[in-house]
């Protein structure tokens, strides 16, 4: 159905949600949605191979990445158009292109901390690889809907029409067509609230958490078609996720739910993701999250209170939810590893200097 139908009644929420990382996690390419620079001198990514560099160009027909190979005396190039932007830009962006009905990732991404272009995460630096397929599980966490085309050749075939970019209302509230039709049929009546729509806040705690866990619960193993999960249904019917106590690598990228469930805060209360997160508006300030901590905790109970005093109220999370290098989002820049730093959701006391 799309968000436009929701705006008819929920304009204020729609306006604030449009600025969130969830909503912006995939977009069509424009001069505003692509954060990388296309101006001369800022549109080149050199590599450790002196015979290879990448050039990013903005043309009337779109935005492009070109691999330039020197094989003296000839120069060879491969150019592909940026068709989809993924990533809100909080950490960075990567770019996808269509080849027929197949989706692939481009070799150059944008890294926000560096304010520049970089080799896409997981790619070998100094290699022009345009052939990494985009699988359904990737799209599930960066879009609202894509329709797969069954193929024995590969999993990255999709219909090029009807897809919905960004995480829209229906990913968390379920299909909205029946709800919208019902409300439109009674324009003078008081809103029915939850008629034919899912309000995650009204779900049992486990089902609430699973709405977030469909993307923030780790990669998991799909056991149902992509985009078939409906909020309120048991997530275990759609994807098998690692148990929060499993003795396995827990990475801060895409596994925030398991880390939260290991936390004493979670296990000794009825806390959910929305206890701390306002999902309909952008929130980034440490003090904002610290206010949530102080709804349950007293500042004087913190071991650092004697040293810092009331100032400690401004930032609980840097000590108790420290930023951690991701093991999965790693790029290579001229032989140096560049890792995304993401907030660890295992809430606890970390001894000074301990690497979480």
What is each residue range found by the language model?
Residues 94-102, 106-140, 144-156:
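Propeptide (latency) domains of metzincin metalloproteases
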Residues 4, 12-86, 94-96, 118-124, ...:
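Primarily the internal scaffold of c-type cytochrome electron-transfer domains
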